[in-house]
Amino acid sequence: MVEAGGVEGALRAARDAKAAGADLVEFRVDPLCEALVGSGVGESAFVEVGHLCGSSVLPCVLTCRVEEEGGAYSGDDVWRGELYGRLLGSETPPRYVDVEVSAWERSAALRERVGGSLGECGLILSAHDFSGVPASLFRDMERMRRHGEAAVLKVAFRA
């Protein structure tokens, strides 16, 4: 995972990852988006993240993780849907976008903006539990699988 606290630093890290044999890189843009949206310059986040995806030497997973699931982004799902939707419609979209299944289920705006724009991009639906192995792990996976749009199902937990 490459954290996108600074776009040029993230791009350097992606080049280093490629040189080490990686074929895919994850850009965690939630710290960047939180800082820019929180400062009232959310439009700059669209530009910066677009530059990140467009300049990466590797296909990327784009993640703007919400606070409830271990990320830094505290804004709304409508803005994240707009971010993902704009990038999915660009000339250099990410290979995957990672969206929390809880957000996917609660936000019609996120589903409409992302689900209708996927094209060649794959959707990763994810769930995170940092307290341990979820007792409902298999039910959660089944619930996630019902969302036919997902190319990848991801569950992260502390073992």
Regions found by a protein language model. Name each.
Residues 24-53:
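Glycine-rich, proline-tolerant flexible connector loops at the mouths of alpha/beta enzymes
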Residues 102-159:
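Catalytic alpha/beta core domains of metabolic enzymes, predominantly
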Residues 8-24, 80-95, 141-149:
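Alpha/beta enzyme core
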Residues 1-11, 66-79, 126-135:
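Active-site mouth loops of central-metabolism enzymes
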Residues 39-48, 77-81, 137-141:
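Charged helix-capping and loop-helix junction motifs
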